[in-house]
């Protein structure tokens, strides 16, 4: 018998609940007043946010964590209680009764549904215990797939641009007063996190991940494919393998929107609605007269040959203009007025770790970006280069932490040439993300490859060493980008503080700004 995710009141337990994808699902379920618990080895603002909506978080991954919901019904209600207008929540059991009306209902099937991601090994103590106890075990994509079926759903897929595009669409629907539920792979200030709960049965905007093949589980009303490239070589051997995953996804979408600027999308998929930055490609949505300056990116938008109006984006780069076109296509399909769409695009401030400004100090701007694939790095550095004006910004400095041995080895040639828009490249050793180094590759190998194509390359293997090395390498007028999907961004505050200390020792008139800025 095929197991199905149960939203009628049975508890959920997430192994690794603090992950960006897992926490978004846990948040939505908790806000739907379902009992939620989970474990994570690190306490973060993400786990604190989950606790704030009633999730019980364990700091260790142990078999006993699964026994939380085997305690008394009163204990369960106390554990998962959420302040909803100052009242105790009710957990519907699907039969017209609620757990708060009749706590004994909680004793029915109290073994939790256990949710895990691809990162959780099968010898994990909680996973092994869940299997032994007979708990229903689901991959996080199973929960997302069930939610997609539960709403009027918009699923954003693609090798690059998923988080920004899904965040843009979610923000647009929010500005249009459509009260969407949103599940994305990054944090957005507009909803103070990576998820938002909206109207029951209303719109759901979700980021749909292809990295492990689970994209094929989703059946959205509207699907978007931003682009298709070979990535995640730990799962896919060839581009054809990736294409097959997206082709299955296409057949499961009621309507597909695709970007014709990606040759693979244009040749391998048949989207019903198309968009492109190039007017000559005949897409349904395109742009003309594109200009960029310190105030943003400006463009005229055309819909099937008819002029719609002008947009202005504050998030930089042609890749983000493409993401905006995807959002416009969705908005128009849903019947939104173009003025509402344009206002949302202008006021959208971006997602965290997507060209996110983390601070400024003595004429240096520090940027955090999740780019970890050669194409993403190239697009991000191109956006950075567009900001160089010779006055406030004069150089682009790229600090990159490679992510996964398999990706570094597979794309070594592409990594070697993707830093052309950086004036200075600083590389660290590879962030393993739990991989074993079967490729016998190191950050030093990457540094040597980049050095063959770039005159200014520095290799500092240790993250701990970067705050001591970098202050001597940067200067006023630099735009410093921290690139990668690993933990490089964690040293940014220390980096800014170290540079501030060093600069104030040599400059008596150093300017001190608020917050992390100096």
UniProtKB/Swiss-Prot annotation:
Localization terms from the record: Cytoplasm
GO cellular component, one term: cytoplasm
Pathway: Cell wall biogenesis; peptidoglycan biosynthesis
GO biological process, one term: cell division
GO MF terms held by the record: ATP binding; UDP-N-acetylmuramate-L-alanine ligase activity
E.C. numbers: 6.3.2.8
Keyword Hydrolase listed: no
Keyword set includes Repeat: no
Keywords attached to this entry: ATP-binding, Cell cycle, Cell division, Cell shape, Cell wall biogenesis/degradation, Cytoplasm, Ligase, Nucleotide-binding, Peptidoglycan synthesis
Main localization category: cytoplasm
One protein family per Pfam: Mur_ligase
Binding-site residues, ATP: 158-164
Reaction catalysed by this enzyme: UDP-N-acetyl-alpha-D-muramate + L-alanine + ATP = UDP-N-acetyl-alpha-D-muramoyl-L-alanine + ADP + phosphate + H(+)
Xref: InterPro entries: Mur-like_cat_sf (IPR036565), Mur_ligase_C (IPR004101), Mur_ligase_C_dom_sf (IPR036615), Mur_ligase_cen (IPR013221), Mur_ligase_N (IPR000713), MurCDEF_pg_biosynth (IPR050061), UDP-N-AcMur_Ala_ligase_MurC (IPR005758)
Family membership: Belongs to the MurCDEF family.
PANTHER family in the cross-refs: UDP-N-ACETYLMURAMATE--L-ALANINE LIGASE (PTHR43445:SF3), UDP-N-ACETYLMURAMATE--L-ALANINE LIGASE-RELATED (PTHR43445)
Functional summary from the UniProt entry: Cell wall formation.
Protein name as annotated: UDP-N-acetylmuramate--L-alanine ligase
């Amino acid at each position: 018998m095929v197991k199905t995710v149960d939203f009628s009141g049975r508890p959920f337990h997430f192994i690794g609940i603090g992950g960006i994808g897992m926490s978004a699902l846990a948040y939505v379920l908790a806000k739907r007043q379902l009992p939620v618990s989970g474990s994570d080895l690190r306490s973060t603002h993400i786990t604190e946010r989950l606790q704030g909506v009633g999730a019980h978080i364990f700091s260790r991954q142990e078999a006993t964590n699964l026994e939380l919901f085997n305690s008394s019904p009163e204990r369960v209600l106390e554990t998962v209680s959420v302040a909803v207008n100052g009242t105790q929540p009710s957990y519907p059991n699907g039969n017209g009764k609620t757990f708060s009306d009749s706590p004994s209902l909680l004793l029915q099937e109290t073994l939790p549904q256990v949710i895990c991601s691809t990162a959780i090994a099968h010898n994990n103590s909680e996973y092994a215990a869940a299997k032994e106890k007979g708990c229903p075990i689901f991959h996080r994509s199973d929960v997302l797939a069930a939610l997609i079926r539960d709403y009027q759903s918009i699923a954003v897929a693609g090798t690059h641009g998923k988080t920004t595009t899904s965040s843009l669409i979610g923000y647009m629907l929010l500005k249009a007063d459509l009260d969407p539920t949103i599940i994305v792979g990054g944090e957005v200030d507009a909803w103070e996190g990576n998820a938002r709960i909206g109207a029951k049965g209303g719109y759901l905007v979700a980021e749909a991940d292809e990295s492990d093949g689970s994209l094929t589980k989703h059946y959205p009303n509207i699907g978007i494919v931003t682009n298709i490239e070979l990535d995640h070589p730990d799962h896919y051997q060839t581009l054809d393998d990736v294409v097959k995953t997206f082709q299955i996804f296409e057949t499961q979408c009621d309507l597909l929107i695709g970007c014709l600027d990606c040759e693979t999308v244009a040749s391998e998929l048949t989207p019903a609605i198309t968009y492109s930055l190039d007017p000559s490609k005949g897409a349904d949505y395109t742009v003309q007269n594109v200009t960029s300056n310190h105030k943003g990116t400006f463009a005229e938008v055309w819909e099937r040959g008819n002029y719609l109006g002008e947009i202005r984006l504050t998030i930089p780069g042609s890749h983000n203009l493409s993401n905006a076109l995807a959002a416009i296509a969705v908005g128009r399909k849903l019947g939104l007025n173009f003025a509402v769409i344009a206002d949302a695009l202008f006021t959208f401030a971006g997602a965290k770790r997507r060209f996110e400004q983390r601070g400024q100090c003595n004429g240096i701007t520090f940027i955090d970006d999740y780019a970890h694939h050669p194409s993403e790095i190239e697009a991000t550095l191109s956006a950075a280069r567009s900001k160089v004006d010779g006055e406030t910004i004069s150089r682009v400095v790229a600090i990159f932490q490679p992510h996964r041995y398999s990706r570094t080895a597979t794309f070594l040639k592409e990594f070697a040439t993707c830093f052309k828009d950086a004036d200075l490249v600083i590389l660290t050793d590879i962030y393993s993300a739990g991989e074993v180094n079967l490729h016998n590759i190191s950050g030093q190998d990457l540094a040597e490859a980049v050095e063959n194509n770039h005159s200014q390359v520095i290799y500092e293997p240790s993250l701990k060493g970067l705050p001591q090395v970098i202050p001597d390498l940067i200067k006023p007028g630099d735009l410093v980008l921290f690139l990668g999907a690993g933990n490089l961004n964690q040293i940014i505050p220390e980096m800014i503080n170290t540079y501030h200390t060093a600069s104030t020792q040599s400059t008596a008139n150093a300017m001190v700004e608020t917050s992390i800025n100096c």
